[in-house]
């Protein structure tokens, strides 16, 4: 979920939040931090205002209560928010839990973790299907010219002539760089109001400024492109 920036090699490199959900588990190990907090998964209605979905529990890992999470972005590209957070919020249907994380580490493009109070494989297996959320404030800090996708969604896009081009509705990773999906109101062939889309590469040659405070992105892009 990152992209190469031909005008600014960092813009758009770290990305997260607009994702393709990964349906499978994968494998390989690297250590992350651990916390000496105690507790157990507990039902909660107190959902953080800045909660961002970052993955889903897909399996147990080992015999001692660890879970395996398929992440929506690789570690180092936003998925490491799971490693940074000491508390996860879990949702499966109408069921919501809050859980402290004792240890976590990467295993290929998954994250494996030990939730407090989950002590055996059966308990870990019972957590399959939970979607995993962390607070936006738990995402690792980025350099000034790097952005998480989740922070770009909904921003207004205008060109250098101040012509409104639409709003960012999503992001695409084409393997080389990130691409903004910019939706704007249009008229269909039947004369009825509809929504159309522009695809604008999120690279320095086109993206001139990203002002998150003003919720605006300025691009070098004509309205008739």
UniProtKB/Swiss-Prot annotation:
Family annotation (SUPFAM superfamilies): PRC-barrel domain, Translation proteins
InterPro entries reported in the protein's UniProt record: PRC_barrel-like_sf (IPR011033), PRC_RimM (IPR056792), RimM (IPR011961), RimM_N (IPR002676), RimM_N_sf (IPR036976), Transl_B-barrel_sf (IPR009000)
Domain PRC barrel stretches: 144-225
Superkingdom as given in the UniProt entry: Bacteria
Keyword Cell cycle tagged: no
Record comment regarding domains: The PRC barrel domain binds ribosomal protein uS19.
Family: Belongs to the RimM family.
Oligomer status and interactors: Binds ribosomal protein uS19.
Protein function: An accessory protein needed during the final step in the assembly of 30S ribosomal subunit, possibly for assembly of the head region. Essential for efficient processing of 16S rRNA. May be needed both before and after RbfA during the maturation of 16S rRNA. It has affinity for free ribosomal 30S subunits but not for 70S ribosomes.
Protein name according to UniProt: Ribosome maturation factor RimM
Gene name of this polypeptide: rimM
């Amino acid at each position: 979920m990152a992209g190469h920036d031909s005008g600014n090699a960092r813009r758009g490199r770290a990305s997260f939040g607009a994702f393709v959900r990964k349906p499978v588990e994968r494998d390989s190990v690297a250590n992350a931090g651990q916390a000496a907090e105690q507790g157990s998964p507990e039902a909660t209605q107190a959902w953080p205002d800045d909660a961002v979905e970052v993955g889903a529990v897909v399996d147990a890992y080992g015999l001692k209560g660890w879970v395996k999470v398929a992440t929506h972005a690789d570690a180092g590209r936003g998925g490491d928010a799971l490693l940074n957070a000491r508390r996860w919020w879990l949702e499966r249907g109408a069921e919501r839990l809050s859980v402290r994380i004792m240890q976590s580490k990467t295993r290929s493009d998954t994250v494996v973790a030990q939730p407090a109070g989950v002590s055996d494989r059966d308990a870990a297996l019972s957590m399959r299907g939970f979607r995993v959320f962390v607070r936006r404030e738990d995402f690792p800090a980025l350099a000034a010219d790097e952005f998480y996708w989740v922070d770009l969604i909904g921003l207004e896009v205008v060109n250098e002539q101040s012509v409104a081009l639409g709003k960012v509705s999503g992001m695409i990773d084409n393997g080389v760089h990130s691409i903004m999906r910019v939706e704007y109101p249009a008229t269909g062939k039947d004369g009825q109001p509809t929504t159309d889309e522009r695809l604008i590469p999120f690279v320095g040659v086109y993206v001139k400024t990203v002002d998150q405070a003003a919720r605006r992105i300025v691009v070098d892009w004509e309205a008739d492109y």
